[in-house]
């Protein structure tokens, strides 16, 4: 399986060169991409976000033969046809629970994780690439309670993209969630490249496991981590 999990924010709004090199390594030409929305009814928002991402790829000399947006403007058979044709699939950010609901409704999981594709997920999309997703309560992000569900099954890790480390209320919810599964808390600069079960980590992150925090494979306090990465 080949995948990229992206936290969701980059200074200067550029796609890291490691991600570009990874894509070009496996798909040298005739790139066809399907963008999977988080809100299948937000047609204008989806189009705007996709156009921005296509421009960012173009700045890095990646162009696409075809670009598809997977949302409710298309029938279920049309979404399946688009995904079968695509060698790149990009799950957009937004409402995490709403996105997995639509993915299940349109029966997209098996098509997303075909071995011949590179799958990218940003923010909510990165979360939903997991196998057994454990999602901490976050009412500000439309997650009213701790949620556990079957993800798409592309990766075997749980992530918390662009984590607000100094939000003590939400961090306590993350600690509770970590009792059920380790969670990788991603800073804005963090992304993960998955290549045939090998995970390569870029940027700064910590692991939260049973309320304990780990940085560079060593147990640490949250403040030690924030001091190390100069978190503002």
Map each language-model feature to its residues.
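C-terminal and late-domain segments of enzyme folds
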Residues: 2-28, 40, 44-51, 135-232
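Structural motif
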Residues: 5, 88-92, 120-121, 159
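ATP/NTP phosphate-donor binding region
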Residues: 14-78, 82
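Conserved acidic residues
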Residues: 31, 87, 156
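A structural signal for short, well-ordered beta-strand segments and their strand-loop junctions
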Residues: 35, 120-122, 184-186
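Flexible gly/pro-rich beta->alpha loop and the following alpha-helix that scaffold active-site loops
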Residues: 65, 69-118
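Class I SAM-dependent methyltransferase SAM-binding "motif I" and its flanking Rossmann-like core
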Residues: 98-102, 108-165
